[in-house]
Amino acid sequence: MTDSTCPMIRNYGAIVPESQTMVKDDSELDIFSEKYREPVFASVLRSIGCFLGYACIPTNGLCGRYYPYKSISKGYRGVVQEFGRVKREINDGMHYVNPVTESISQVDMRIKVIDLDKKDVMTSDKLSIKIDSVVYYQVTNIHDALFKIDNVVQSIIELSYATLRNVIGNSTLEVCLTRRDKIAESIKSIVSEATNGWGIEIKSIQITDIVVPTDIINSLSSAIVAERQAEAKIILAQGNVKSAELMRQAADMLDSKVAMQVRSLEVIDKLATSNNSKIVFLPTDLNLSTRNNIIYSDIQSTN
């Protein structure tokens, strides 16, 4: 119902003033149990309200603010106040109120989302980034949400920003980029603990975007390229050292007399198995029996 037809019904935004966040003392909130002496004039006003309300019932709401039945939308809850004091809480539906002495404050009980604008934050490695995030919350206690905290939405925004700066300030850029969900969960835990007693529940906090400036991206890319080039040089140097070691070991093996004789025999064997005519020069360091065997095998193959 709009303000023009029912000005006594106020929405949540109208109830909570745009002021500095302030939690009220519990002693000021004991409005259900505190007893007080009602002035006689209050009874007179209540009687007048009842008369006007019942008189306006046949008009089916044409009397405007004096129509006694007010509706609460689905997903909302209301608090009925009389002379500034809470009388009862009401659910969605049609309810009778005294049009003179009573008013209804409505609160949206559905899950709501707050889109936090991008903020510049500094990581622990002194890099400035922009972070975009959203907060999902729900009112769970209408009484606390109305009377324990001024401007719930603004309070959640300021608390979320402060927590975001603190958590990101203790994390490196690499952690922010690779462990976004863990950071969001840490922020949610801190904000939930701080809002305990506000009559709300923080359902979720999500980091939707992390913007890294172009100059930081370029510098990081250069650092990564340099690091990979250094690693490649190290791998190449290690390969050269290994290759040199293997070549040295092979040279040591070939320098031995046994190795030289084996290689000579291999060459002579290849020559002996060839069909072409050949002249074989035998090394002088071979012993006589070996030379005779070679010559004999060569003659046999020729025949």
Curated annotation (Swiss-Prot):
**Superkingdom of source:** Viruses
Q: Which SMART domains match?
A: PHB
Which Pfam family is one of those matched by this entry?
Band_7
- Quote the cellular component terms of the Gene Ontology held in the record: plasma membrane
Question: Which family does the UniProt entry place this protein in?
Answer: Belongs to the band 7/mec-2 family.
UniProt name for this protein: Putative band 7 family protein R614
What lineage is this protein's organism placed in?
Viruses, Varidnaviria, Bamfordvirae, Nucleocytoviricota, Megaviricetes
